[in-house]
């Protein structure tokens, strides 16, 4: 409880007083309830009530003070850090990684200084990640490195990965690119060097004794080395809810630590001797595997459990967790926002709090085979259930069958672990014994892959929830608390009515699970919404009609890698969009379709792709159409004058709003060699809102459309043609549209000079308010207003 109070203090500083003080008041209320409802200890608790409340208040404000100290320390030097600033950094390497063709060295206990004579005073700073082309040092080395500052970027689109928040939560303030290690001191680092060599040798041995896919998974699971982890397997495990097995956590620490601890105890070693032997071993394993936050939590809890045995006491899981949470947050209060830490803590809370109330209250020896199986199932539910809101908060989707998959996966983990460890150790000596020893792990991992691929084919395997509003978290965890209280009451009243108790328990479990799942998956009704995504040099536009029909326009980029996987899909999932009814493609340039190709390959549901009739002969478009058909997506061809109607039905079952998309260009007789001259152009109408979307058409085509449609082009919103190029957005075109708002989608730095000053001046002269994705990030139109900086 004290750990929760301490956490509340940090939450108040990190996320706002409303959340932090609300959590604090909840903690105090729980303390009062415990003091006046726990019969066995009511008198003792009442006498200590004042002490509990006083300590809670002290911890709450101590946490706030600690957060402020750390935050002020960070601000004191980050205000002087700018991108590409030349600096010198001194620090100790705590972890090394090889990723995307370069080495990353994580430095702690850092000091830094500018390389210019005017700012070369040395000052303390937070942790730093150094990017190098070659492995110039090892873990444990104290180094001096020169380089240029790389500030981590914040997310500029809803759902996009926020690098700044991610690194900040781990205490890393900036990166050092083009880094060069000038000097290093290694005389006391022999221990770290030995562990790194052991890790590297074991990882290389796994590559020698088995295939690359299996070696990548085993290296991640056993050694914390994700350099060779197959992205397809990583995504597959995530979608099916078993990605936790890839991280070094309590499960892995338990397998290693408990195995040695029990072996020593069986051989007659005392509690103290076992503790003194296993503790250095488990600490060394933690350092070797990268010492992630979840690993620190697991190692700390395991050591506390062994220490309790040394003093003749029984270790308490929740108290150990609380102690480690306070230790971790004291060291780095920003860890409160780290996903791995949150998952780790919530999983243990599920085991320690929810599981005892989810399983039957029957002695193990009195349980039937069916009851044992039932308890295993509900134990899995109890662990997974509290984690679902956290999963939805981070991935905007939940794996429906995760409970069943984990029931089959977790019991086989020791087989993988033991087989992998022995195979990697033997492989360091000779390949043949390693190849034999790795076979059990190989076959179990193949079973995992087969199981996961089967599960994702089942209906509803992956439910897109969207970003959860605060009220859903409140309702979900309040519902879970009510369930625990209800079962507690049932257990008190069961006495001799065991049969009646079991029936009520089954009903309560099912009702609770169904209710909590409904809280997560039921989506509120939506209103019309337009989003122009920040995809760098490219286009990506989402629109939701009042009727609920959801469409997407283009989707590509030439400067942002994997724009479909990293920006478009996360945005759609963040907004709870399970499928796109119509995906419009203006033309087949890469900055308009690269992301769409990725979305198709991901298996995301698209009902129709809409292209211009005249685009059939375009080679790149033909390739896209072929890919669409491969994934079962229907392709619609439009020409000038064609209309796609969406109906909006009011409460009286009457169609009361015009919702349509009218194709303006090209017609069947139009033909130009340049793709830009043949862009699919259309007008979108949704009740009192309208918009013009014309891809990359030049001013000549704009003039042609003005002469054909005249005042029919008038619209509220205009997506600037060709990213605001010099030869688009002509004066006559803008006068015909007369837009209130104009969005320009382009990269901050591009070789085309977008947006051109001439185009910007013409748009401003037309009286339109301009929004730039390169400055504002994602641009959102909702409830008759435009919003910037959706971050």
Task: State where each predicted segment sits.
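Aromatic-rich juxtamembrane segments at the membrane interface
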Residues: 4, 169-301, 306, 385, ...
């Amino acid at each position: 409880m004290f750990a929760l109070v301490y956490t509340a203090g940090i939450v108040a500083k990190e996320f706002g007083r409303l959340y932090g003080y609300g959590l604090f008041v909840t903690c105090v209320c729980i303390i009062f309830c415990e003091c006046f409802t726990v019969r066995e200890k009511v008198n003792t608790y009442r006498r200590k009530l004042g002490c509990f409340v006083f300590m809670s208040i002290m911890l709450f404000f101590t946490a706030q003070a600690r957060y402020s100290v750390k935050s002020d320390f960070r601000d004191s030097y980050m205000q002087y850090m700018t991108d590409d600033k030349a600096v010198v950094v001194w620090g100790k390497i705590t972890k090394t990684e090889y990723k995307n063709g370069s080495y990353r060295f994580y430095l702690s206990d850092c000091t830094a200084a500018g390389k210019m004579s005017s700012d070369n005073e040395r000052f303390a700073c937070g942790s730093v990640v150094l990017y190098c082309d070659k492995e110039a040092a090892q873990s444990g080395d104290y180094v001096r490195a020169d380089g240029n500052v790389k500030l981590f970027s914040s997310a500029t689109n809803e759902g996009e990965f926020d690098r700044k928040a991610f690194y900040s939560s781990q205490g890393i303030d900036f990166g050092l690119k083009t880094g060069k290690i000038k000097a290093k001191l290694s005389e006391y680092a022999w221990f770290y060097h030995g562990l790194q060599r052991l890790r590297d040798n074991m990882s290389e041995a796994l590559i020698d004794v088995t295939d690359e896919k299996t070696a990548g998974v085993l290296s991640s699971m056993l050694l914390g080395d994700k350099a060779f982890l197959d992205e397809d397997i990583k995504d597959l495990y995530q979608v099916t809810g078993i990605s936790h097995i890839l991280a070094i956590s309590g499960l892995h620490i338990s397998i290693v630590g408990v195995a040695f601890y029990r072996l020593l105890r069986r051989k007659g070693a005392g509690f103290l001797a076992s503790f003194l032997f296993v503790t250095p071993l488990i600490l060394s394993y933690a350092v070797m595997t990268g010492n992630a936050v979840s690993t620190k939590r697991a190692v700390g809890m395991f050591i506390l459990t062994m220490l309790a045995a040394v003093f003749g006491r029984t270790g308490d899981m929740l108290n150990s967790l609380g102690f480690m949470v306070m230790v971790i947050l004291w060291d780095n209060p920003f860890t409160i926002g780290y996903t791995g830490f949150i998952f780790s803590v919530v999983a243990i809370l599920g085991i320690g709090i929810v599981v005892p109330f989810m399983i039957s209250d029957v002695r193990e020896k009195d349980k039937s085979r069916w009851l044992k199986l039932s308890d295993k199932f509900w134990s899995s539910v109890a662990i997974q259930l509290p984690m679902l809101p956290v999963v939805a908060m981070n991935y905007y989707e939940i794996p429906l069958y995760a409970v069943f998959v984990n029931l089959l996966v977790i019991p086989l983990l020791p087989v993988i672990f033991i087989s992998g460890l022995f195979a990697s150790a033997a492989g360091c000596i000779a390949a043949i014994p390693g190849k034999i020893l790795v076979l059990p792990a190989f076959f179990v991992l193949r079973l995992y892959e087969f199981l996961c691929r089967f599960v994702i084919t089942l209906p509803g395997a992956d439910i897109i929830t969207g970003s959860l509003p605060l009220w859903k978290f409140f309702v979900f965890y309040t519902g879970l608390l009510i369930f625990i209280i209800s079962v507690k009451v049932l257990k008190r009243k069961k006495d001799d009515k065991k049969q009646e108790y079991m029936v009520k328990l089954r009903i309560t479990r099912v009702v609770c699970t169904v209710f909590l799942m409904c809280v997560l998956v039921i989506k509120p009704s939506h209103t019309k919404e337009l989003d122009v995504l920040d995809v760098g040099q490219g286009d990506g536009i989402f629109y939701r009609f009042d009727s609920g029909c959801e469409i997407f326009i283009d989707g590509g980029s030439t400067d942002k890698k994997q724009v479909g996987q990293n920006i478009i899909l996360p945005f759609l999932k963040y907004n709870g969009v399970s499928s796109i009814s119509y995906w419009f493609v203006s033309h087949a340039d890469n900055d308009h379709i690269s992301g769409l190709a990725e979305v198709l390959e991901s298996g995301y549901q698209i009902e129709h792709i809409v292209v211009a009739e005249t685009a059939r002969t375009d080679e790149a478009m033909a390739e896209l159409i072929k890919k669409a058909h491969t994934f079962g997506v229907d392709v619609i061809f439009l020409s000038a004058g064609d209309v796609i109607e969406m109906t909006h039905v009011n409460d009286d079952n009457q169609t009361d709003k015009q919702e349509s998309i009218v194709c303006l260009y090209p017609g069947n007789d139009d033909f130009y060699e340049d793709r830009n001259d043949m862009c699919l152009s259309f007008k979108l109408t949704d009740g009192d809102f309208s918009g013009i979307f014309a891809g990359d058409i030049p001013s000549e085509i704009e003039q042609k459309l003005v002469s054909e449609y005249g005042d029919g082009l008038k619209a509220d919103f205009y997506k600037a043609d060709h990213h605001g190029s010099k030869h688009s957005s002509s004066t006559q075109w803008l006068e015909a549209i007369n837009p209130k708002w104009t969005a320009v989608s382009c990269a901050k730095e591009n070789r085309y000079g977008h947006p051109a000053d001439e185009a910007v001046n013409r748009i401003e002269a037309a009286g339109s308010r301009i929004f730039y994705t390169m400055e504002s990030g994602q641009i959102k139109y909702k409830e008759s207003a435009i919003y910037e900086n959706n971050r």
